[in-house]
Amino acid sequence: MFVVGRDAFLIRPESSVEFLRRGNSPFLTGLRILSGRILSVFSPGRRRTIQAVTATIGIRGTAVYIEAATDRTYVCTCYGTVEIASRGDPTARETVRTKHHDQPRYVMASGAPQMIMGAPVVNHTDAELILLEALVGRTPPFGTAQPYRY
């Protein structure tokens, strides 16, 4: 678990993640998730991009949980807005706006009949989101009462 600027991250074991910056800028511009799982909270303002094997996710100040594998990427927009695009089919795009884990998605590898599809909420907790937001002096929009695990 760590903080970069006003963003906080919880990287699960056996994950491989690269942090992206432009030139010598101190600001994070995005992440490349090579494999594994990461829960992230991002401050509003600057746009960032998360790249996984099968998906590109445009961040607009939000919280996301991502599981990246070679055959699919799981994306839960815990709250906020993201733009999800398939890397295997650039025409497969979706804007997701949520308040509280409303629309998790799978983004499939190329060749799948449907590139972006609904998914269940899995493997992350509201308590983890509350902790990450607290590290950067914020609270999640759903509050702190009765956190639960999915």
Regions found by a protein language model. Name each.
Residues 3-150:
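Flexible, surface-exposed loop/linker segments and immediately adjacent secondary-structure boundaries
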